[in-house]
């Protein structure tokens, strides 16, 4: 799994499972609204009055109507930790 997917997948999956209404802003400024029906590596299927397949490369921002609970983040090494290990380079 690519590093970018490790944040995307739990977030989109929580929105899908909880049927949270979302606003999706495209890079051209268009705002789409609905619920995430499904998604894969390249597209999000958005449901409102009709189903829309939205390509992820066209998406700027996904804004949920409410907060969602996702899986806890995987701890990563901070810059301070790595500096200490290497003698404060």
Swiss-Prot record:
Residues of the Sm domain: 9-68
GO molecular function: RNA binding
Biological process according to GO: regulation of DNA-templated transcription; regulation of RNA stability; regulation of translation, ncRNA-mediated
Disordered: region residues: 70-89
Domain of life: Bacteria
PROSITE patterns: SM
A single Gene Ontology CC term: cytosol
Pfam families listed in its UniProt record: Hfq (PF17209)
Keywords in alphabetical order: RNA-binding, Stress response
Bias (Polar residues): 78-89
Gene3D superfamilies the record matches: 2.30.30.100
InterPro entries in the cross-refs: Hfq, LSM_dom_sf, Sm
Family: Belongs to the Hfq family.
Function, in words: RNA chaperone that binds small regulatory RNA (sRNAs) and mRNAs to facilitate mRNA translational regulation in response to envelope stress, environmental stress and changes in metabolite concentrations. Also binds with high specificity to tRNAs.
NCBIfam families: Hfq (TIGR02383), PRK00395.1 (NF001602)
Quaternary data: Homohexamer.
HAMAP family (UniProt xref): Hfq (MF_00436)
Name assigned to this protein: RNA-binding protein Hfq
Species per Swiss-Prot/TrEMBL record: Alkalilimnicola ehrlichii (strain ATCC BAA-1101 / DSM 17681 / MLHE-1)
Name of the gene: hfq
